[in-house]
């Protein structure tokens, strides 16, 4: 009996520390396993209808969500005329550069009114429960463009804090803007970036702030659509200085948080500080404040 007691004591004394030594790794591996499974289930939901999915891929540019188009009908508010259009569906492989997880969840649950983006969560009247929305979010996280210069050097570049688009992608954005100036489409880099079509408008301002831009029939630039009207010096009234406006565009709006002059965030305005360079944002601000 004494021997068994000593053996048990030795097992506890030696075994438990050894067990706890490996416990953090075990938990980390278990968490990674759950996340991978959730992402896999999310991919099935994201897939095209023919494969049993909800056709997110069909609109947003395939399983990597690089940007696509959705068939939609729009009604002219003045004439009542109805017509079919092809609506630019933005790339989602940078969506977490622009929005927080809570903001992405809100968009998935409630959709974007007056656009092809329907509500998908049961809270918004859609077909997906909370777990399915979570699975979609895990899948979207798994296809993000890897970030450069994360705050923590060895963090997962798909979902790390801080960081920005790879320099090569930012160079592509700049090159696309410069081409549209060189060919005479736009008169300045700021105007070109404001209207940038790369990624089906994922990096542009006009997608939300110019009526009709999303289906190729833009009205007055910056006159307001899903985003508010920027014309007539509106931004100069809302932001006392150029730097205030730059800081707002970099961070985006935060639900309930104040910004500018008597502004309160809705969470709908994405942050562009991780996708565009400081110089690119400054070009946009100069264009909006001086030309709209």
Give the predicted meaning of each segment:
Residues 42, 51-63, 104, 136, ...:
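The canonical Cys-X-X-Cys-His
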Residues 54-58, 119-120, 146-155, 203-207:
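Surface-exposed patches in mature extracellular/periplasmic domains of secreted proteins
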Residues 22-50, 67, 157-201:
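Electrostatic cytochrome c docking/interface patches
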Residues 40-57, 99, 191-206, 216-219, ...:
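Sequence context surrounding c-type heme c attachment/ligation sites in exported
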Residues 73-143, 217-292:
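Extracytoplasmic electron-transfer domains, predominantly the class I c-type cytochrome c fold
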Residues 65-69, 125, 142-152, 185-192, ...:
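Inter-heme linker and motif-flanking segments adjacent to c-type heme-binding CXXCH motifs
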Residues 3-19:
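Hydrophobic membrane-insertion alpha-helices, especially the h-region
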Residues 37, 52-53, 63, 70-73, ...:
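Extracytoplasmic/periplasmic mature domains of Sec-exported, cell-envelope-associated bacterial proteins
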């Amino acid at each position: 009996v004494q021997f068994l007691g000593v053996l048990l004591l030795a097992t506890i004394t030696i075994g438990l520390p050894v067990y706890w030594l490996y416990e953090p790794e075990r938990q980390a591996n278990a968490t990674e396993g759950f996340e991978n499974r959730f992402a896999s289930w999310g991919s099935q939901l994201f897939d095209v209808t023919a494969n049993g999915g909800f056709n997110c891929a069909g609109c947003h540019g395939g399983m990597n969500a690089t940007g696509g188009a959705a068939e939609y009908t729009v009604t002219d508010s003045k004439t009542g005329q109805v017509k079919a259009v092809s609506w630019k569906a933005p790339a989602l492989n940078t969506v977490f550069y622009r929005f927080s997880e809570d903001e992405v969840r809100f968009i998935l649950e409630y959709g974007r009114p007056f656009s092809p983006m329907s509500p998908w969560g049961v809270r918004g009247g859609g077909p997906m429960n909370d777990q399915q929305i979570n699975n979609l979010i895990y899948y979207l996280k798994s296809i993000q463009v890897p970030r450069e210069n994360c705050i923590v050097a060895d963090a997962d570049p798909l979902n790390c804090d801080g960081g920005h688009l790879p320099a090569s992608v930012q160079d592509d954005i700049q090159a696309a803007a410069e081409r549209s100036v060189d060919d005479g489409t736009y008169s300045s880099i700021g105007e070109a970036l404001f209207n940038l079509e790369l990624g089906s408008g994922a990096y542009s301002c006009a997608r939300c702030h110019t009526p009709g831009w999303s289906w190729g029939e833009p009205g007055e630039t910056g006159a307001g659509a899903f985003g508010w009207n920027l014309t007539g010096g509106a931004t100069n009234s809302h932001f006392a200085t150029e730097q205030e406006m730059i800081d707002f565009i970099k961070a985006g709006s935060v639900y309930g948080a104040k910004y500018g002059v008597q502004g309160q965030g809705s969470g709908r305005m994405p942050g562009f500080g991780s996708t565009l360079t400081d110089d690119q944002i400054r070009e946009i601000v100069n264009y909006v404040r001086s030309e709209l």
